[in-house]
Amino acid sequence: MAPDPDPVTKPTRATGPASVWYEAVMWVAMNAAERDEFLAGVHVGVLSAAIGTAGHTLAVPVWYSYQPGGLLTVLTGRRSRKAAAMRAAGRFGLCVQDASPPYRYVSVEGPVVREEELDPVERLAMARRYLGAAGGNRYVADNPDLGRENVAFRMRPEHWLSQDQGRQAQG
């Protein structure tokens, strides 16, 4: 019987680019500074919030903004299912990820501390964050009712989960 191939190139059930290194990596939790920096980066977040009392959960992609150590902000339609769920539950979660190897993610959950209109400067900054300067400017100009139709939910992060598959565990 032939010896096992090198663990880095050993065939796995994984497909795509991860199959080469899949078994040679470890999931390592990020420290507070790393998770803050990652969450502050530009990612589409997946917001989750409880719907009703039957244990159902709403999970939808959203734009968000976050400054390390501060509140996390999501912008949504004032009458949307997301807004209704966050109001009713009084809290929500958000997960962001890097979908390219080595994989990383940060998941955060906490209470809604404020619901308010997003001022025009912050609304433009969020549009530029996701669409670039020209695209953000055009998006805001083409949607003059954003200020009346949307609302910002601010969350204070309480519970964090994070993993970085590109780091080795410190032993």
Predicted regions and their residues:
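Short, solvent-exposed aromatic-acidic interface loops
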Residues: G77-R81, Y130
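Extreme N-terminal basic, low-complexity initiation segments
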Residues: M1-P5
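Short, surface-exposed beta-strand-loop junctions and turns on beta-sheet-rich folds
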Residues: S80-K82, P101, A169-Q170
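Charged, gly/pro-rich active-site loop segments
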Residues: D6-A29, R104-G171
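Short, basic/aromatic recognition patches
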Residues: W21-V46
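Short secondary-structure boundary segments
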Residues: D98-A99, P157
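A generic secondary-structure signal marking the coil-to-beta-strand transition
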Residues: R35, H43, G70, R104, ...
